């Protein structure tokens, strides 16, 4: 185990929609890497229970995606509350990274942070105010060197842990092809 202020916290959420004011978190996962993007540990992967009245608010895309992945069933059967998910995730993070030092890392991570701020503020406060957003590099690559995008593809399972692993792999790909580090 390697507790360090250089470690990075990666997080991904699956939600019932895109609006944190009306939608809910239904899955959370986290991974800690070192500064070289080597995975040190995977945190708890938690389906967060939401009542049926929240699940019926999902649009067709969310309903189809989260049903086919098995997530909707996991959410229905889960006894993990949002607060339970916060406590378990923080308990994991405290073993690897001091509070307030790691940027929040992921793909389109600003969206996840909006949901954390609204529904899991104690967890949101664990991160530094900075972002390490892989989608920023993707957008710049799309504009400046689009042929590089052909060399990386994602499975797109829309399960939180898979999405984090893909984000880390994508950042490694950009490091090797664009930054040549």
From Swiss-Prot:
Domain of life where this protein originates: Bacteria
EC number in record: 3.1.15.-
MF terms in GO: 3'-5'-RNA exonuclease activity; nucleic acid binding
Cellular component terms per the entry's GO annotation: cytoplasm
All copies of domain Exonuclease, residue ranges: 8-171
Active site: 129
Pfam families: RNase_T (PF00929)
Coiled-coil residue windows: none
Any one of the GO BP annotations: DNA metabolic process
Keywords: Cytoplasm, Exonuclease, Hydrolase, Nuclease
Compartment list: Cytoplasm
Matches recorded under HAMAP family: Oligoribonuclease
Known role: 3'-to-5' exoribonuclease specific for small oligoribonucleotides.
Family: Belongs to the oligoribonuclease family.
Protein name: Oligoribonuclease
